[in-house]
From Swiss-Prot:
This is DNA-directed RNA polymerase subunit omega. Its EC number is 2.7.7.6. Promotes RNA polymerase assembly. Latches the N- and C-terminal regions of the beta' subunit thereby facilitating its interaction with the beta and alpha subunits. GO terms for cellular component: DNA-directed RNA polymerase complex. The RNAP catalytic core consists of 2 alpha, 1 beta, 1 beta' and 1 omega subunit. When a sigma factor is associated with the core the holoenzyme is formed, which can initiate transcription. It is an enzyme of class 2 (transferase). Pfam families: RNA_pol_Rpb6. GO terms for biological process: DNA-templated transcription. It comes from the Bacteria. The lineage of its organism: Bacteria, Pseudomonadati, Pseudomonadota, Alphaproteobacteria, Rickettsiales. One of its GO terms (molecular function) is DNA binding.
Length: 127
């Protein structure tokens, strides 16, 4: 029964991977949020089946589901700005060594490396 529903959903969401992610998100919302009035009619079905049916029927806004999914994946911590000037000076001192770090194009440390081709034989990439 769910397979037919998944095929019906392909008309609304053609990408199966996207369908799986969005249907999973909606099923979790059905499971955790109180929607007892709407689920009573479909009580014998599990949340994934209900989610697929509602997506296939167009009862669910795909854009809203995507936005809800994106919001759920965002970090919830907020970065507080530095208020104290002394703190910012301390942080500068901690990272002063970074100006000494440099990136070069010198790969001489790879000279003694052994490279193996797909046949398992040694080869020199410079030749």
């Amino acid at each position: 029964m769910a397979r037919i529903t998944a095929e019906d959903c392909n008309k609304i969401i053609p990408d199966r991977f996207r369908l799986v992610v969005l249907a999973t998100r909606y099923a979790k919302l059905l499971n955790y949020k109180v929607e007892t009035n709407q689920i009573k009619k479909e009580k014998r079905d599990k949340p994934p089946v209900i989610a697929l049916r509602r997506i296939a029927a167009g009862k669910v806004s795909v854009e809203q589901l995507e936005q809800d999914l994106i919001n759920s994946l965002r970090t919830k911590t907020m970065i507080e700005p530095l208020v104290n000037q002394d703190e910012s000076e301390d942080i500068k001192e901690e990272f002063e060594y970074l100006s000494e770090v440099c990136i070069t194009e010198d790969y001489s440390d790879l000279d003694d490396q052994i490279f193996i081709d797909e046949n398992g034989e040694d080869y020199d990439p410079d030749k």
